[in-house]
Swiss-Prot record:
Summary of the function given for this chain in its UniProt record: Specifically methylates the pseudouridine at position 1915 (m3Psi1915) in 23S rRNA.
Subcellular location(s) per record: Cytoplasm
Subunit structure comment from the entry: Homodimer.
Chief site of localization: cytoplasm
Family: Belongs to the RNA methyltransferase RlmH family.
GO molecular function, one term: rRNA (pseudouridine-N3-)-methyltransferase activity
Catalytic activity: pseudouridine(1915) in 23S rRNA + S-adenosyl-L-methionine = N(3)-methylpseudouridine(1915) in 23S rRNA + S-adenosyl-L-homocysteine + H(+)
Organism this protein belongs to: Xylella fastidiosa (strain 9a5c)
Keywords per UniProt: Cytoplasm, Methyltransferase, rRNA processing, S-adenosyl-L-methionine, Transferase
The keyword Repeat appears for this protein: no
Any Pfam family: SPOUT_MTase
Protein name per its UniProtKB record: Ribosomal RNA large subunit methyltransferase H
HAMAP family assigned to the protein according to its UniProt record, in alphabetical order: 23SrRNA_methyltr_H
Binding site for S-adenosyl-L-methionine: L74, G105, L124, G125, P126, L127, T128, L129
Amino acid sequence: MMKCLLIATGERVPTWVAQGFAEYHKRLSYWLPLELVEIEPSLRGKNHDPQQAIEDEGRRVMAALPKQPYAVTLDVKGKSLNSEQLAKRMEHWRGLGRNLVFLIGGPEGHSQEVLNISNERWSLGPLTLPHMLVRLIVVEQLYRAATILTNHPYHRGK
């Protein structure tokens, strides 16, 4: 079975985000075991260099990657998918036989190094979302995609 990681920059999330993530993580584990890897964010303050923070976080993300992963980067410039399209992508990813990694960056996004290793870029749409909330949305959408593939009634669709 392939290994699936969600590598997210940021360690302290609100309790309600952690609880929501835990619920969908538990539900998803039946179809797709997912491991959350939290990356320590770079310090930010009024004198911080955002580019340096991006590069530092990028190095930590790269160090956390398994060998030869299929990397799906959450990126505002990525491709937006509806739930059915995501289910088809999930089916494709499962058939690759490679470790699957979803990458969530920090407040300023991903380093160029991380973007360069990405096999796909996925956008959650044009809304600006708190990066801590993205992990909850991603795990819920992966669960929804799994239920679509198995005709589970969670996704009522069209």
